[in-house]
Amino acid sequence: MKKKIFAMFALLLLFIPSFVFAKSYDVDEYLKLDFDDDWYVFTKSNIKDNKELEELGVSEEYMENLFKSSNVVVDAILFADDNNDTKEVFVRTTETKDLYNLNDNTDSYINEFADGFISSVKEQGIEVVNSKVYKSNNNAYVYLEYSDSNLNVIEYFTVVNGNGYAIQVQKTNSFTESEKDSFEEIIDKASFKILKQEKNDDNNKEQEKENNKSSNYVTNIIVGAIIGALVGALYGLIYTKRKAKKNKSEK
């Protein structure tokens, strides 16, 4: 009888879906991102005494240097059986004095901005394979797919509260449609605390001048700070360590 009950229970489990829970991370004072719990996610505020960093054999000092040297505020990694399918997500930020909130502008300005942004990326020698304006959750992004440093990259870029945010995922192999959808879901769930720019008469005049500037003027400054694949971050370090350990064990 007990065996029969156990068999029925085991069969029932086959039809119960497994759930992957998401956790919310504070990127900075304005942005929160959700990642499923199978991601390793590191931010400026959570690396101290972080057990997952210890598990990966990565030092707090290494992460601090990465954050300082690359305008990075988030480094998240999702391991795959095939190293070439391991995905790494970065969020990079840069100040944008000439633009406060991208989505506060007209569609024509946003499209012009996107065109200027894409042109500036191409001028960096980066091969852009797909691009568009993407709108989600009351925000506007410039969407890019490109190749750089033998890595494939998908990037969403926006400007909120006078800060440019580049949210990108990269891996060696090409992205599947399912992977693109999964990353898009992270973007769709991104939560920005959007502040309205305080304006007086002088500010209005200055803003009008800034909006009349060529989008290329604005985007050339931004692109130089946050575009391109990041080589030698978590994935590079962990892969190198694992390879060295494997070589040592084979001797």
Give, region by region, the residue ranges found by the protein language model:
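Positively charged n-region of N-terminal signal peptides that target proteins for export
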Residues: M1-I5
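C-terminal single-pass membrane-anchor helix
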Residues: D201-K251
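Proline-anchored loop/turn motifs at beta-strand termini and strand-loop-strand connectors
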Residues: D28-K48
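Conserved polar/disulfide-associated segments of primarily extracytoplasmic proteins
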Residues: I47-I154, Y165-A166, K209-S214, Y235
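Bacterial N-terminal signal peptides
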Residues: F9-P17
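Sec/Tat signal peptide C-region and signal peptidase I cleavage site
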Residues: S18-S24
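Surface-exposed amphipathic alpha-helical segments
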Residues: D37-V41, Y165-S215
